[in-house]
Amino acid sequence: MSVNFELQAEPRADQGKGASRRLRRAGKVPAILYGEGKDPQPITLDHNAVMLNLEHEAFYSHILSVKLGGKAEKAILRDVQRHPCKPIILHLDLLRVSEDHAIRVHVPLHFTNEESCVGVKTGGGMVSHQMVEVEVECLPKHLPEFIEVDVASLNVGDSLHLSQISLPEGVSIVALSHGPDHDLPVVSILKPRGAAAEEEAGGEAAEGGEAS
């Protein structure tokens, strides 16, 4: 189900570390809204609202509506700075987007049919994720909240690569634009631990026989 995210923002005049600390003590998060040929706009956001939004996976790969001065601007989350020890958001970077300009965003991967996968159900294999997200390029209207990766047909020893992912309309994977060497595995079905150990032991025994 699609979720709409709205951020109520206020313009921020004071900048610098001291001003940012004062904002955080007041329950605010300093942020910057930039891009699309416009001047960067320092803003503040409500810390509790930001924390709640960050709990949603879709918030990281979604077109956000930033309400500022009675107007709404579309943006994507570009960066989050967190306190290393405390549950505090230090700063957000928000990138403006327009309907006719392509954007690049990291989108989470959702793996389906893992339990019914051939290699798991009949071969006793284990699913191994090499990636949990992928960078895509698309127009804002085509941006998916996540991409499904179906592993049902994978057998033991099989891997599914980037080029084998079924993509929504208008969406491409950035890595594949750099050539076939970047068509990396996304998920693999590993051999059962016992079988892998037996193969290794068998290989060592064969080497020992040849040496003698």
UniProtKB/Swiss-Prot annotation:
- Which Gene3D superfamilies does the annotation name? Ribosomal protein L25, beta domain (2.170.120.20), Ribosomal Protein L25, Chain P (2.40.240.10)
One Pfam family of this chain:
Ribosomal_TL5_C
- Keyword set, alphabetical order: Ribonucleoprotein, Ribosomal protein, RNA-binding, rRNA-binding
Q: How does it assemble?
A: Part of the 50S ribosomal subunit; part of the 5S rRNA/L5/L18/L25 subcomplex. Contacts the 5S rRNA. Binds to the 5S rRNA independently of L5 and L18.
Question: Any one Gene Ontology biological process term?
Answer: translation
The entry sums up its family as follows: Belongs to the bacterial ribosomal protein bL25 family. CTC subfamily.
Ranges for region Disordered: 1-22
Supply the NCBIfam families for this chain.
bL25_bact_ctc, PRK05618.1-2, PRK05618.1-5, PRK05943.1
Query: Has the keyword Ribonucleoprotein been applied to this entry?
Result: yes
Report the protein name in the record: Large ribosomal subunit protein bL25
What this chain does, per the record? Answer: This is one of the proteins that binds to the 5S RNA in the ribosome where it forms part of the central protuberance.
Organism, scientific name: Thioalkalivibrio sulfidiphilus (strain HL-EbGR7)
Q: List the disulfide bonds.
A: none
> Which cellular component terms (GO) are annotated to the entry?
cytosolic large ribosomal subunit
Q: Name one GO molecular function term.
A: structural constituent of ribosome
